[in-house]
From Swiss-Prot:
Domain of life the protein comes from: Eukaryota
Expression across tissues: Expressed by the skin glands.
Keywords attached to this entry: Amidation, Amphibian defense peptide, Antibiotic, Antimicrobial, Cleavage on pair of basic residues, Immunity, Innate immunity, Secreted, Signal
Subcellular location: Secreted
Main location: secreted
UniProt name for this protein: Dermaseptin-B4
Comment field (misc): The primary structure of this peptide is identical to that of Insulin-releasing peptide from Phyllomedusa trinitatis (AC C0HLC4), and Dermaseptin-2 from P.tarsius (AC P84922).
Described function: Potent antimicrobial peptide with potent activity against Gram-positive and Gram-negative bacteria. Probably acts by disturbing membrane functions with its amphipathic structure. Has an activity of stimulation of insulin release, which may protect the species from being eaten by predators by causing fatal hypoglycemia. Has hemolytic activity.
Length: 76
């Protein structure tokens, strides 16, 4: 009977250890996926920042040219 108890405890212990290892791997995979998502969102933010910066420059130049033309026409 004692032999069966020891065997049962050994099986349960090994099962818990393998379950623990699987859970740890799941957490690591989840963390890696979240990190990749964070990196992608940072890249998107940087891209939008560049786009908005270029649009702002173009709009500023257009306004400056329009105002300059209006001033030049007023002087003539």
């Amino acid at each position: 009977m004692a032999f069966l108890k020891k065997s049962l405890f050994l099986v349960l212990f090994l099962g818990l250890v393998s379950l623990s290892i699987c859970e740890e791997e799941k957490r690591e995979n989840k963390d890696e996926i979240e990190q990749e998502d964070d990196e992608q969102s940072e890249e998107k933010r940087a891209l939008w920042k560049d786009i908005l910066k270029n649009v702002g420059k173009a709009a500023g130049k257009a306004v400056l040219n329009t105002v300059t033309d209006m001033v030049n026409q007023g002087e003539q």
